[in-house]
Amino acid sequence: MTPSPVLNLLVSNDDGIFSQGVRTLANTLVAAGHEVTVVCPDRERSATGHGLTLHRPIRAGIVEDVFDPRIKAWSCSGTPADCVKFALHAVMPRYPDFVLSGVNHGANLGTDVLYSGTVSAAMEGLIEGIPSIALSLVSFTATDFQPAADFANCFVQHLWRSPLTEPTLFSINIPAVPAEQIAGVRLTRQGLQRYSETFEERYDPRGKRYYWLAGERVKEIPQPDYLRLNRRIPTDVQASQDNFITITPLQYNLTDINGVNIIEKTNWLDHLNFD
């Protein structure tokens, strides 16, 4: 039997350094024999996307007595993307084998990945050429992150032994059910979700008006045919509803190849009158 590799891993998240998800993930990985460095926001930073801190100082410090003592842990006042940048360029003496982000408390499915700090932390690793993994538990209330952490350990070992030809970000959503109720693992494509957005008008104790973003998710919307997506592969939203672990490969390049081809083929820009 091939011995398990000892991997150099960076772990971050957007739920903050004290969240149960990142603690379970990091402790599970170090217990499996890996070298683990944790750099996380010092507070909740969900839905911050890929924002960076550019106009105020970033403060960071070593965190003790939160994780397994074998783990080097830091908290950072910045965003999830800041945390990964800081880890790669100010904390770790060499780049990690993989960047992991999570385990997030709540799903990151469909177009939600565009807002997700969890996915953006992993995307920062990918931008640096490091294979990266974003892990999310499909529940905002469940508290058992162990099945997700165990799957993460299994996945990084598989990725090490069978690497893809190019670095990829894997967005992985794990059902919040007992391990025996997980239906399996599915390769998925990104779905399309929209929300019924509501800005609730409220007033603070001083009578000043403010707004609170609320709303509910609208059912998944079919994606247009011109995207030429492989319909045989289910969306992450569909497979997650059936209690599958979903694995969606993502990239940072947002170029609309279909749009480029149409514009080039029709000489569309030739008709732009700009003197």
Curated annotation (Swiss-Prot):
Q: What NCBIfam families does UniProt report for this protein, alphabetically?
A: PRK00346.1-4, PRK00346.2-2, surE
Which GO molecular function terms does the record list?
Answer: 3'-nucleotidase activity; 5'-nucleotidase activity; exopolyphosphatase activity; metal ion binding; nucleotide binding
Q: What does the protein in this record do? A: Nucleotidase that shows phosphatase activity on nucleoside 5'-monophosphates.
Superkingdom, taxonomy of origin: Bacteria
Cofactor note text: Binds 1 divalent metal cation per subunit.
| SUPFAM superfamilies, A to Z | SurE-like (SSF64167)
Catalytic activity of the protein: a ribonucleoside 5'-phosphate + H2O = a ribonucleoside + phosphate
Q: Where does a divalent metal cation bind?
A: 14-15, 46, 104
Q: List the disulfide bonds.
A: none
Chief subcellular location: cytoplasm
Cofactor requirement: a divalent metal cation
Question: What is one cellular component GO term in this UniProt entry?
Answer: cytoplasm
Matches recorded under Pfam families: SurE (PF01975)
> What's the protein here called?
5'-nucleotidase SurE
Compartment(s): Cytoplasm
EC id: 3.1.3.5
| The species this protein was found in | Synechocystis sp. (strain ATCC 27184 / PCC 6803 / Kazusa)
Q: Which family does it belong to?
A: Belongs to the SurE nucleotidase family.
Lineage of the species this protein comes from: Bacteria, Bacillati, Cyanobacteriota, Cyanophyceae, Synechococcales
Tell me which UniProt keywords the record has, alphabetically: Cytoplasm, Hydrolase, Metal-binding, Nucleotide-binding
Task: Look up the signal peptide feature and give its range.
Answer: none
